[in-house]
Amino acid sequence: MTLNGWIQILVFCGIIGLLTKPLGFYMHRVFNGDRTPLSPIFGPLERGLYRICGTSEREEQHWTAYAVALLLFNLAGFLVLYALQRLQGSLPYNPAGMGAVDPALAFNTAASFVTNTNWQNYGGESTMSYLLQMAGLTVQNFVSAATGIAIAIALIRGFARASGKSIGNFWVDMTRCTLYVLLPLCIVLTLVYVWLGIPQTLGPYVDATTLEGAKQTIALGPVASQVAIKMLGTNGGGFFNANAAHPFENPDAISNLIQMVTIFALGAALTNVFGRMVGNQRQGWAILASMGALFIAGVAVCYWAEAAGNPLVHALGLDGGNMEGKETRFGIALSALFAVITTAASCGAVNAMHDSFTALGGMIPLINMQLGEVIVGGVGAGFYGILMFIVVAVFVAGLMVGRTPEYLGKKIEAKEVKMAMLAILCLPLAMLIFTAIAVVLPSAVASIANGGPHGFSEVLYAYTSAAANNGSAFGGLSGNTPWYNITIGIGMLMGRFLVIIPALAIAGSLAAKKTVPASAGTFPTDGPLFVGLLIGVIVIVGGLTFFPALAVGPIIEHLAMIHGQTF
């Protein structure tokens, strides 16, 4: 590790800290329905969309109606995206002549982008046409991100309201998020990326002749606009197979910094939105502090492991850290930082190959996802994920002091705890069961490139990434097979919707409750004691569930590497 590396990490953290409050202030006004500087521009369009859809901003929904609207909208998006893939060969804006996508891969991709996972069992430049990238994948990047933020806002309303029957309107929340938050920021980011050299064109691929006289096809396309939303919306799916390691997606250190900041920006701002909506900004800062502590710990371990490198390479007299699978324009520090950011959020974009990280370096992204990506998390998804842990933490605190658990004046009772635990436990259910089957199924084992514990880690990482709606991968697993396409697709759907429904149920239950005034015995939830308790619950409840699997995978691999054994 170097001083320069830590300075870059601290600069990133400082920028996120500076952006959290102003972004939170703006987003709070958007979802409150207050006037914003963009209201004269998007206001008429917003009202027109409501008239077309037959809804009104004054019409609110019970949590069940909110959930039904959300599920129907996502089902429609899934079917449209699947159809676009199957009909690709007959559709325009296909200069490379791409054919129809295989049915199993089309199912996997549709599930991937609808759930904000963006797991890719294909190379974008060799499989998807310009039309599919724009009208299919990029559109889902917007609406899946807006869906996640809408759920977070609905859950916050559950804590903020008292004796209410509704938690907002899904159509209104999603429309406002898209028009006032995602779209304006993405327009600005797209222009910045084009200025930095990222392509944005509908022209055909370019054929070039190299210095050796060989022919090479250079893939182009509407890249900048997709990169903007894939990072801001924590989608992560790359236009190119190499994702953010490709120079056309992430050309230099400036674009890399912007992309890292945009991955965390909205997720961090939601903590401030929470504080404003419940009337106590200290509550939001306490949540952000717990996220920040876990994040810094993850960055420190990952950076240390990658900077220390491989002892087997050190024995050869080479001591430069682990640069395998990393871009020289980013180096070890920014590669490790990006890896932790992209897995702390449910982004999944990569600027280095996680499969080439050391055993401990690769374990940190894995743990981030297994914790439910509650360290800032995806736009909306991470925040409603950490609120599930907050419900459990408050319940534990209540048990310790012998009082009925309360949070923000709302009594946390059996229903809320059961729903929170259901949301928390559905992730290991999807991650571990599919992994267990895959490592004993011959057709699934055949896709594993490496033996021993690293091969197991590749499979575990795949299903962990799917259920956590992350989308990053250990590249040694060949996932484009019927087994992996279907089971990973199912895992993505489970990880998304089996968390959403309990979260909305908690929102509806809390919104209907009366607010209880704080008393001398009320456990304070805006101080360092609560931050420590929340971190402890996340690590114990979320982390220990996966310890046996981690012991079989990266931990054994690390111990074997120390003793000179590789896989």
Curated annotation (Swiss-Prot):
Lipid bilayer topology: Multi-pass membrane protein
UniProt main location, coarse: membrane
InterPro entries: KdpA
S-S bonds: none
A GO CC term attached to the entry: plasma membrane
Transmembrane residue ranges: 5-25, 64-84, 136-156, 179-199, 254-274, 285-305, 330-350, 357-376, 421-441, 486-506, 529-549
Subunit note: The system is composed of three essential subunits: KdpA, KdpB and KdpC.
Function per UniProt: Part of the high-affinity ATP-driven potassium transport (or Kdp) system, which catalyzes the hydrolysis of ATP coupled with the electrogenic transport of potassium into the cytoplasm. This subunit binds the periplasmic potassium ions and delivers the ions to the membrane domain of KdpB through an intramembrane tunnel.
Name of the protein described by the UniProt record: Potassium-transporting ATPase potassium-binding subunit
Lineage: Bacteria, Pseudomonadati, Pseudomonadota, Alphaproteobacteria, Hyphomicrobiales
